[in-house]
């Protein structure tokens, strides 16, 4: 292994850093002193590029990606990477990794770029302790902070990803996202057709949607904090067409919709498991779109929510659900034998809510006194049959 140092040299006609990379032997370590180095680098051999000062910047010329990696076993450490191109189709990024393995990007800062880190068919690589943001545009015109495509067995840990558009995983399996912070993004983590991923101990705040899962299998979401999604329709967790989905030990607070679950009426066997979560202070704790089936909801705490359960179109609560041993602060039953379990089930019905199931414009009057009165009258003397949308057969009588 060779180690050599490179100091910043200003030149209009040469790129000393690219020259150093071209001349470096495999597994060389290139150490950079403070300064601004030209970007648009192409790395095609295993090397380590490390900043040994606090102000080592690799700056692109505003065209293409700042660093493109075509070799496995490349490490980037302690760098500021900035000023990519702006071509959305070409996915201009701070760092673009292309069909590589065993790479590492750690303790880097990414700013003023279109995309942050683009991982295209990358395996067994690590993105660790980076601060990633993108150029300040309208959120729909920003690029993703992190993009994984056909990328497997990677570790994304300890990063702060903020003020980007999305973080996406497409066709990407067996990845670990752990101890990251996601703030001020659109879809903070969006997994689509990606299986056996683990999201653990991450923190989400001020995103439009915290987590989104579409067409995923065998995914585990463990001990995350999903808080304060923004906007009137801000969603903490959005779940659609998932199977063997485990959601355990999470805290979901201060969202318009805590957990939004889309279940197709004809879909069966899409198992979802919600255990030991705290779902609190949301406008809607659980929002179901269409049918309510194949859910196991046990040992959770629901408190401080405006509505515990809502359903926005037709669909039944059927016997495939297992709902028990949850704490609901609205439960008004008794515990005669003192075993901590309510003597009667906790049932949630739709009364006046049925009106906006047929006409969503009616929800404009959601908190109006006339709707509250109508809801009270329907409970007192129902003249239309209410829908049972949730039944906890063994509700916890007091918080546990």
Language-model segments: residues:
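Bacterial N-terminal signal peptides
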Residues: 2-11
């Amino acid at each position: 292994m060779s180690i050599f140092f490179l100091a910043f040299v200003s030149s209009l006609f040469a790129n000393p850093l690219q020259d150093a990379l071209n001349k470096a032997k495999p597994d060389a370590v290139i150490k950079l002193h403070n300064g601004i180095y030209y970007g648009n680098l192409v790395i095609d051999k295993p090397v380590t590029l490390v900043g040994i000062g606090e102000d080592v910047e690799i700056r692109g010329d505003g065209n293409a990606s700042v660093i493109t990696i075509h070799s496995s076993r490349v490490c980037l450490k302690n760098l500021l990477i900035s000023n990519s191109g702006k071509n959305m189709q070409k996915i201009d990024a701070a760092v673009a990794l292309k069909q590589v393995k065993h790479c590492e990007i750690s303790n880097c800062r990414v700013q003023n770029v279109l995309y942050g880190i683009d991982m295209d068919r990358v395996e067994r690589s690590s993105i660790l302790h980076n601060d990633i943001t993108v150029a300040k545009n309208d959120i729909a015109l920003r690029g993703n902070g992190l993009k994984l495509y056909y990328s497997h067995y990677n570790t994304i840990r300890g990063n702060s990803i903020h003020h980007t558009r999305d973080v996406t995983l497409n066709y990407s399996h067996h990845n670990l996202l752990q101890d990251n912070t996601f703030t001020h993004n659109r879809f903070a983590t969006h997994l689509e057709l990606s299986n056996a991923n683990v999201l653990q101990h991450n923190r989400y705040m001020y995103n439009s949607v915290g987590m989104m899962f579409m067409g995923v299998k065998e995914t585990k979401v463990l001990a995350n904090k999903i808080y304060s999604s923004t906007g009137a329709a801000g969603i903490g967790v959005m779940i659609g067409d998932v199977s063997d989905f485990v959601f355990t030990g999470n805290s979901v607070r201060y969202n318009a919709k805590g957990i939004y679950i889309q279940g197709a009426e004809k879909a069966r066997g899409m198992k979802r498991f919600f255990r030991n979560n705290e779902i609190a202070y949301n406008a809607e704790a659980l929002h179901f779109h269409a049918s309510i089936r194949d859910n196991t909801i046990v040992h959770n705490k629901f408190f401080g929510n405006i509505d515990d359960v809502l359903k926005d179109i037709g669909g039944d609560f059927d016997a495939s659900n297992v709902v028990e041993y949850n704490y609901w602060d609205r439960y008004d039953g008794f515990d005669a034998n003192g075993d901590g379990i309510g003597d009667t089930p906790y049932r949630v019905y739709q009364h006046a809510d049925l009106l906006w199931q047929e006409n969503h414009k009616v929800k404009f009057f959601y908190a109006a006194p006339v709707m509250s009165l109508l809801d009270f009258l329907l409970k007192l003397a129902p003249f239309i049959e209410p829908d049972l949308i949730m039944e906890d057969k063994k509700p916890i009588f007091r918080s546990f």
